Amino acid sequence: MDATTIDLEQMGRAAKTAAMTLGQLTTLQKNTGLLAMAAALETHADTILAANKADLAAASALPEKFVDRLALTKARIADMAAGVRQVATLDDPTAQTDRAWVNEAGLTIAQKRVPLGVVGMIYEARPNVTVDAAALTFKSGNAVILRGGKEALHSNLALATVLQDALAAKGLPRDAVQLITDPSRAVATQMMHLNGYIDVLIPRGGKGLIKAVVEQATVPVIETGAGNCHIYVDAHAQLQMAVAIVVNAKVQRPSVCNAAEKLLIHADVANEQLPVIAKALQDHGVELRGDERARAIVPSMHAATAEDWDTEYNDLIMAVKVVDSEEEAIQHINAHNTKHSEAIITDNYQNSQQFLQQVDAAVVYVNASTRFTDGYEFGFGAEIGISTQKLHARGPMGLAALTTIKYQVLGNGQIRKN
């Protein structure tokens, strides 16, 4: 067994020990730790920024949107601290009993929420994920092992150290938050195989990262993130509403997973509405790639290829298709989407209900932007990711998604008779 594997197993054992302690903490103790972490981020902002500067220097040749996600400022650190404080205000899911009842044998059965144990996070060069994950796992009573992108290594190490020291200063386990400092793929693969130490693995990043984790991990995985999201403009759509929703969903933050990537429009309204929607998008710098029917209506569009329908652009690009029916739109969406967020724009109630029932996605909208798929917008507070799978958690994952169920049964000598 090589040294790296031994180191990861040592981290796993330390995380398990920390998780046992975290599971016994009161909500007050957890909130005390969170407030200490928030204060430490602000106190040590200069140290964090110095580390981030080293990462930015090494990443200067990378795309601007990548560098922007990597960059930290005092304002962004203040936002991180505010986010941690906000987590402290959220209800503690482990302090609640979901339901309780007495069965025919006189047993009192209570269904409670308990921490998952040790959460592993594999994510790309987004230092804010380090803080978000630490805060959410701590509040829900879990330890976390973090493995961020190599481009953010100095930033992540500085952040993790600040958070660990803040916990230790309050007499709380510093191993509640651990960071893997070897950014190699080999170590990431070994992390995916830490069965017995990591209870669940959550990848956050692009399609390639998520696919690699899902295919290679032997640890249970919650699949998150990739968002090939569609907006379908129905034959009964209001033009003004369609323009506003499509532009918001595509333009506001094109690099995030809840941005719309595809526009489907019913043939009955395409001649009237598509030129207006297309102009609004193009006025915001969006490159449109259309099928033959869309390009016949808006000749300035580029030709869409078969690959376009399955591509998450994360950029100011949108593919457009004209469909003859809602059934065709639903069939296309279910064939090409990533089960993230899908929307219909319509004034027809029956069409809206058909869309809600037949589209397979974590979140399905009627007359609203896909950009609302977010823990804060759903009232969950911060989120650790957006699950696109069906088991355990689906959609924006807040604190409750980082817990599981335990049944506590109280008796007074009952034995089963048959």
Curated annotation (Swiss-Prot):
It is found in: Cytoplasm. GO terms for molecular function: glutamate-5-semialdehyde dehydrogenase activity; NADP binding. Its main location: cytoplasm. It comes from the Bacteria. Keywords: Amino-acid biosynthesis, Cytoplasm, NADP, Oxidoreductase, Proline biosynthesis. Catalyzes the NADPH-dependent reduction of L-glutamate 5-phosphate into L-glutamate 5-semialdehyde and phosphate. The product spontaneously undergoes cyclization to form 1-pyrroline-5-carboxylate. This is Gamma-glutamyl phosphate reductase. It comes from Lacticaseibacillus casei (strain BL23). The lineage of its organism: Bacteria, Bacillati, Bacillota, Bacilli, Lactobacillales.
